[in-house]
Amino acid sequence: MGFPKEGEKVQIHSYKHNGSIHRMWEETTILKGTQSLVIGANDRTVVTESDGRTWITREPAICYFHANYWFNVIGMLREDGVYYYCNLSSPFAYDPEALKYIDYDLDIKVYPDMTYTLLDEDEYEKHSEIMQYPPVIDTILKRNVAHLTQWIHQRKGPFAPDFVDMWYERYLMYRN
């Protein structure tokens, strides 16, 4: 597996456990790309859902993907602060087509005051049964929910106070 280069524009593909496409983001600019970490940014990019419907993101977002963790984090810059949407997912993979991951339904929404809510537990239970997630997936995801909430409390990684603003400034250099 290679990794995307700084300044490169890539698609992001989200899949379900059964291999079906879940969602595609048309264009994300890579701000940092290594074997273990990818940081990207997008603004008003086209998103295509599995049923073919499309929509456009409303605000700039910084995307954080790590090869060693079963989650990715999207920091969205809004007028009243940074909101985070965290997807419990497989670690990322990259090929010339796109940056890819498997979405495992559970999400954590983090508000500007760093309070958070675990979302979609019912969807996870349903898909776990339908797609027959192996028991090890449940163990891995529970461990990563704990890891992610620890990062939120500690303001670590993408939740660090200046993380999103710093990477957004870098993104603006590529837009001009």
UniProtKB/Swiss-Prot annotation:
Gene3D superfamilies in the record? FomD-like
Q: Which InterPro entries match?
A: DUF402, FomD-like_sf, Ntdp-like, SA1684
Q: Which UniProt keywords apply?
A: Hydrolase, Magnesium, Metal-binding
Question: Is DNA damage found in the keyword set?
Answer: no
Q: Which residues bind Mg(2+) 2?
A: D105, D107, D120, E123
Reactions performed catalytically: a ribonucleoside 5'-triphosphate + H2O = a ribonucleoside 5'-diphosphate + phosphate + H(+); a ribonucleoside 5'-diphosphate + H2O = a ribonucleoside 5'-phosphate + phosphate + H(+)
GO: which molecular function terms?
magnesium ion binding; nucleoside diphosphate phosphatase activity; ribonucleoside triphosphate phosphatase activity
Which residues participate in Mg(2+) 1 binding? N87, D103, D107
Residues at the active site: R23 (proton donor)
Q: Does the keyword Magnesium apply?
A: yes
**Disulfide pairs?**
none
EC id: 3.6.1.15, 3.6.1.6
| Enzyme class, UniProt record, top EC level | hydrolase
Give the cofactors, semicolon-separated: Mg(2+)
**Family designation:** Belongs to the Ntdp family.
Q: What does this protein do?
A: Has nucleoside phosphatase activity towards nucleoside triphosphates and nucleoside diphosphates.
Know the name of this protein?
Answer: Nucleoside triphosphate/diphosphate phosphatase
Which species?
Bacillus cereus (strain ATCC 14579 / DSM 31 / CCUG 7414 / JCM 2152 / NBRC 15305 / NCIMB 9373 / NCTC 2599 / NRRL B-3711)
- Taxonomic placement: Bacteria, Bacillati, Bacillota, Bacilli, Bacillales
